[in-house]
Swiss-Prot record:
ATP binds at residues 102, 292-296. One of its GO terms (molecular function) is ATP binding. GO terms for cellular component: cytoplasm. It catalyses: a 3'-end 3'-phospho-ribonucleotide-RNA + ATP = a 3'-end 2',3'-cyclophospho-ribonucleotide-RNA + AMP + diphosphate. This is RNA 3'-terminal phosphate cyclase. It is found in: Cytoplasm. The gene is rtcA. It comes from Methanopyrus kandleri (strain AV19 / DSM 6324 / JCM 9639 / NBRC 100938). Belongs to the RNA 3'-terminal cyclase family. Type 1 subfamily. Its EC number is 6.5.1.4. GO terms for biological process: RNA processing. Pfam families: RTC, RTC_insert. InterPro entries: RNA3'-term_phos_cycl_insert, RNA3'_phos_cyclase_dom, RNA3'_phos_cyclase_dom_sf, RNA3'_term_phos_cyc, RNA3'_term_phos_cyc_type_1, RNA3'_term_phos_cycl-like_CS, RNA3'P_cycl/enolpyr_Trfase_a/b, RPTC_insert. Catalyzes the conversion of 3'-phosphate to a 2',3'-cyclic phosphodiester at the end of RNA. The mechanism of action of the enzyme occurs in 3 steps: (A) adenylation of the enzyme by ATP; (B) transfer of adenylate to an RNA-N3'P to produce RNA-N3'PP5'A; (C) and attack of the adjacent 2'-hydroxyl on the 3'-phosphorus in the diester linkage to produce the cyclic end product. The biological role of this enzyme is unknown but it is likely to function in some aspects of cellular RNA processing.
């Protein structure tokens, strides 16, 4: 049996390589060996969160695995057929729900029916897309490709306690349409969600107010920001925690997102301003996708029916790394015209 070999220390060298490689393995049916997993990190190897992501994909495709344990720097993943159905995953910590779903939703494209998965963990945690971004930006772009990906948040989960609950439904598409979205068009709206749990309601209100002031001043548009709070005594969250997600939409259906998380000792106004300033900065590049959406959508475009071209507000280190992994599995060429951290145009040409 020949294995696709992936060096987990390549490029960005983090959990993204693992998630993309395992998702692509299940999608294509190609077995993979991933070594040097997170080799350059302070604590190398599989973390709790990464372990659960691999296990979740393995469960939906009956994969045979080797090396699945905390701290392991090498795994072998041999996928079977991807099966629709209902699944449950408990990360058991504040590990990111959305990062786990990155791998699962890629694999689910090959399923023989809809995949429904209830995931417990962190919905709004550092170094990962907040769940409101996943719903309002990520799922929006997948829908444009023809992939229906729906999320329902039953409970939010923040660091360190987690406890969030999200129900995801993925309907495998017959085909994926290519994407052409280089330049952000005429700004039509800015929307958002500002939330707080196990905290006074004014925290979410102040986040939204601070963000609104910057958006009105810099963009000349009044944003619609939903306030999500819970009355004391009827708050089901383990909390405390807060955050804000914003997204701007143009006249062509392109969306750019931005977000910020609350932290102990960080004023709510700072949280709101952080997200708004990030959004304004990204919009000023004139590109259609924010840097995070760029690397997240790339694997899906690699199996689309035709060439795609899109603009990103900046080249995230995950983007060239994801391109490298995808090219290991599929006859596709990815060209990134721009430097890391700067706006760029990306062309994806499936050759199959």
């Amino acid at each position: 049996m020949s294995l696709i070999e992936i060096d987990g220390s390549y490029g960005e060298g983090g959990g993204q390589i693992l998630r993309t490689a395992v998702g692509m393995s299940a999608l294509t049916g190609e077995p993979v060996r991933i070594y040097n997993i997170r080799a350059n990190r302070p604590r190398p190897g599989l973390s709790h969160q990464h372990l659960h992501a691999v296990k979740a994909v393995a469960e939906i495709c009956d994969a045979e695995c080797e090396g699945l344990e905390i701290g392991s720097t090498e795994i072998v993943f041999e996928p079977g057929k991807v099966k629709g159905g209902e699944y449950e995953v408990d990360i058991g910590t504040a590990g990111s729900v959305t990062l786990l779903l990155q791998a699962v939703k890629l694999a689910a494209i090959a399923a023989d029916g809809p995949v429904e998965m209830e995931v417990r963990g962190g919905t709004d945690v550092k170094w990962s897309p907040p769940v409101d971004y996943e719903i309002n930006v990520n799922a929006h772009y997948l829908d444009r490709l023809g992939y229906r990906y729906e999320l329902e948040v039953l409970r939010r989960g923040h660091y360190p306690r987690g406890g969030g609950i999200v129900r995801a439904r993925m309907e495998p598409p017959k085909r994926l349409k290519p994407l052409e979205a280089v330049k952000f068009g005429e700004l039509e709206s800015v929307r958002g969600i500002s939330h707080c749990v196990r905290l006074p309601p004014h925290v979410a209100e102040r986040q939204a107010k601070a963000a609104s002031e910057i958006i009105e001043r810099e963009l000349g548009i009044r944003p619609e920001i939903e306030i999500e709070t819970y009355p004391k005594g009827r708050d089901p969250h383990l909390g405390p925690g807060s955050g804000i997600v914003l997204w701007a939409e143009d006249d062509q259906g392109n969306r750019i997102g931005a977000d910020a998380l609350g932290e102990k000792g960080k004023p709510a106004e700072v949280v709101g301003r952080e997200a708004a300033e990030q959004l304004v900065q990204r919009l000023r590049t004139g590109m259609a996708l924010d840097e995070h959406m760029g690397d997240q959508i790339l694997p899906f475009l690699a199996i689309a029916d035709g060439e795609s071209v899109f603009g990103v507000t900046g080249v995230d280190p995950h983007l060239p790394t994801n391109a490298w992994v995808v090219e290991k599995f599929l006859p596709v060429s990815v060209e990134i015209r721009g430097k890391e951290g700067e706006p760029a145009t990306v062309e994806v040409r499936p050759e199959g």
